[in-house]
């Protein structure tokens, strides 16, 4: 019996390694064409060059929003700053690899909630096929938002399907929401929809104590990521410009005549 158990554990370990390598191979195929790839010497596209320029400015003591204009979230510039510390201009590719790998991993994990391993690997391949051309641009805010979305989707679905929940999971879910808010807030629909579903369920079943528990630990996770970024902006006198560029500017930009209004506003 002991030998059988050891054999099963060994088989599971081998299977886990094989799946990890498979996901790594899929990730590599997805982003090897990225302009910031260490194997690619093609021209970096406009958005990515802006992010890396701001990261370079940060290395010189400048601040996004205050000294350099852009309307993306501060986490994106921090990611590029860390990438440049790893390897000048190319180091962000390693972070990109981790982000895409986590996305693939949680696509697999989410599919595994209701499918066998083979079907889950097929799901990863299908998703990778759909995203293949998209990742060619490289170093986009959506790339870094997707692992946060994948993690949160897994946590929400595991809760609704299997009732698996814990303080850690709630904080991780809040952390992922904070990450997307600090990258690209128009991608937060998943948290809005599923959080409303949880709230409605708790109210309907009169589980208000559970609801307060969920909200508390979700908010803790959210502010673990968001608060340090906001403090960093405040301390460096960039918070007012952050509100102007990231919130006000994007609200105008998202309207029907946003492009014209934005240009007029910037040149008033």
For each of these PLM feature ranges, what is it?
Residues 137-145:
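Short acidic/glycine- and proline-prone juxtamembrane loop motifs at membrane-interface regions
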Residues 74, 78, 86-105:
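Loop-to-helix entry region of an early transmembrane alpha helix in multi-pass inner-membrane enzymes
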Residues 4, 190-226, 241:
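Perimembrane helix-loop-helix junctions
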Residues 169-185, 191-196, 224:
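Membrane-interface alpha helices of multi-pass inner-membrane proteins
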Residues 1-33, 112, 167-170, 213-220:
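Start-transfer (signal-anchor) and selected internal transmembrane alpha helices
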Residues 112-118, 152-172, 203-205:
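Membrane-interface transmembrane helices that cradle and orient dolichyl/undecaprenyl
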